[in-house]
Amino acid sequence: AEFHIAQAVGAILEEDHQNGLAHFLEHMAFNGTEHFAGKGIIEYFESIGVNFGGNINAYTSLDETVYRLSEVPTTREGIIDSALLVMHDWACGLLLLPEEIDAERGVIREEWRTGAQANRRMWKAINPLKYPGSQYAKRDVIGDTAVINNFAYDALRDYYKKWYGPDNQAIIVVGDIDVDQIEQKIKALWANVPARENRGERPLYSVNDNEQ
């Protein structure tokens, strides 16, 4: 089965001094949650044949962040419960511990370095032409290295609490499952997911026409 949680939260919501936090949060989802300490998510699911990278992964774009568990065996109800518990923790239970944040700064820097190739430079050069005068031309998903290196721990926690909440989330489960049972399990788990703190209204950024 496939278990996805889609957050309507991407780099487009960042202020300049936050550029990179949406992507950083995505990485932190695999570095300790309420019910899965440390690398517990990866360790548990790899123990049942669900591989990190191919089947346990996530991505961040300008408009969304999506986390997924793919090809999860559904032969045992306990596995289904664990997969839904991971979705719950990604929704509201990231620990965001200082030592894990600092360790991940280096991972993101390396991702930034290895991605600084010709295609990325072309992307950055072309975007202002594709989206003239728009926030979409300005924002870079992987972020600003100065922000990545120096943001305060609470800056990431505040961003998480501000934007991650039930009104910005969708749970998708596809596979050989009992739909009614899964729906009831999701409702029970999400009953205690808190509303967003310091709730921000999600801005809608337009894309202007160009001559082409």
Question: Where is each model-derived feature located?
Answer:
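Active-site SXXK
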Residues: 19-33
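Non-catalytic beta-strand/loop surface segments
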Residues: 1-13, 35-76, 100, 114-168, ...
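Generic, well-ordered alpha-helical scaffold segments in large soluble proteins
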Residues: 28, 86, 90, 111, ...
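Active-site alpha-helix of zinc metalloproteases
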Residues: 15, 19, 171
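Divalent metal-coordination and catalytic microenvironments
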Residues: 23, 67, 87, 108, ...
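Helix N-cap motif at beta-to-alpha junctions
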Residues: 73-76, 176-180
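M16/insulysin-pitrilysin zinc metalloprotease superfamily fold
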Residues: 32-35, 69-104
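Extracytoplasmic/secreted cell-surface and envelope-processing proteins
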Residues: 37-38, 179-183
